[in-house]
Amino acid sequence: MQNIPPQVQAMLGQLESYQQQLQLVIQQKQKVQADLNEAKKALEEIEKLTDDAVIYKTVGTLIVKTTKEKALQELKEKVETLEVRLNALNRQEQKINEKIKELTQKIQAALRPPTAG
């Protein structure tokens, strides 16, 4: 890195930072997607039950009885919240990818040898 100009070194540092941010966003996205899939599956199963079915849910370390109606409402809200979060993470991932692409182009241009005109 001795031959690399300081401004390019700074850009490389920024690029590394963006890549780390991207990794974190991707990990968060995977977690939210898994939670969303799980919530949708639970919603499907509860919708199959009769209205008077006995349903239990976990609350912290407890398991408590609930109604089908309450369980459906809570799961629908959870799915909606997770979908909003997933959309936000998708936008964030896209913005970071754009920054990475832009910065990579700047770095490549800065390292390109000047052409004799």
From Swiss-Prot:
InterPro entries: PFD_beta-like, PfdB, Prefoldin
Subcellular location field: Cytoplasm
First-listed, main subcellular location of the protein, grouped into a coarse class: cytoplasm
Keyword terms of this UniProt record: Chaperone, Cytoplasm
Subunit structure, as described in the record: Heterohexamer of two alpha and four beta subunits.
Function: Molecular chaperone capable of stabilizing a range of proteins. Seems to fulfill an ATP-independent, HSP70-like function in archaeal de novo protein folding.
Protein family according to the UniProt entry: Belongs to the prefoldin subunit beta family.
HAMAP family hit by this protein: PfdB (MF_00307)
Pfam families: Prefoldin_2 (PF01920)
Organism for this UniProt entry: Pyrococcus furiosus (strain ATCC 43587 / DSM 3638 / JCM 8422 / Vc1)
Single GO cellular component term: cytoplasm
Gene3D superfamilies in alphabetical order: 1.10.287.370
Name of encoding gene: pfdB
Top-rank taxon: Archaea
UniProt xrefs under PANTHER family: PREFOLDIN SUBUNIT 1 (PTHR20903:SF0), PREFOLDIN SUBUNIT 1-RELATED (PTHR20903)
Bilayer-spanning residue ranges: none
Protein name as annotated: Prefoldin subunit beta
GO molecular function, one term: protein folding chaperone
